[in-house]
Amino acid sequence: SGHGCSLVIADLPGVGESRDRDAEYEALYRDILPELDLVLWLIKADDRALSVDEYFWRHILHRGHQQVLFVVTQADKTEPCHEWDMAGIQPSPAQAQNIREKTDAVFRLFRPVHPVVAVSARTGWELDTLVSALMTALPDHAASPLMTRLQDELRTESVRSQAREQFTGAVDRIFDTAESVCIASVARTV
């Protein structure tokens, strides 16, 4: 890494493939989730079947709900998909309304701590919003490694500011902890 910090991204298998696989994945999720700083729960914009996602949320993920950021993906495929403005890299008004309805529906269903973000990786639409949401959702110690690996166009001033604030917060906590340990040690000696 060279910066003294690291970023590990793990792509876990999605749910809903089969009952046998879901049971296997449930065990995997229970084992690995406590080790993660953040889970990006991806839901395709045109996917209406969310019952398996809902089951996993309620029974596995909800305990660590502050660690989950829901992302509606493939926003450019939202109906009417032929209306996507490729030149302006944005949805048509009808698509924008449908995307809002989808993110609202995901929010109502899962009631996450963090806002639901919609993106189109193919077109780059709202990736900066996703990065900002990631910076907000990640614990302070994990935001700095993300910042160092972002493409320049995603390092907006807002993201840079968030990274500075989170780094300062992490350093402050380290000093507070060190000070508490020193005070406790002195108190025991006296």
Q: At which residue positions do the language-model features occur?
A:
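A conditional alpha-helix N-cap/helix-loop micro-motif detector
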Residues: R21-D22, L50, A96-I99
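Short amphipathic alpha-helical segments
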Residues: R21-D22, V52-Y55, H82-W84
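Conserved beta-strand segments of the P-loop GTPase G domain that flank and frequently precede/overlap
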Residues: L40-A45, F70-T73, A118-S120
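Canonical P-loop GTPase G-domain recognition
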Residues: Q74-T148
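Inter-motif core of Ras-like GTPase G domains
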Residues: D20-D47, F56-Q67
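P-loop NTP-binding site
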Residues: V119, V131-L138, Q151-V190
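Switch II (G3) loop of P-loop NTPases
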Residues: G2-Y25
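Short acidic, S/G/P-rich loop/turn micro-motifs used as interaction or catalytic elements
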Residues: V15-E17, A45-L50, D76-E79
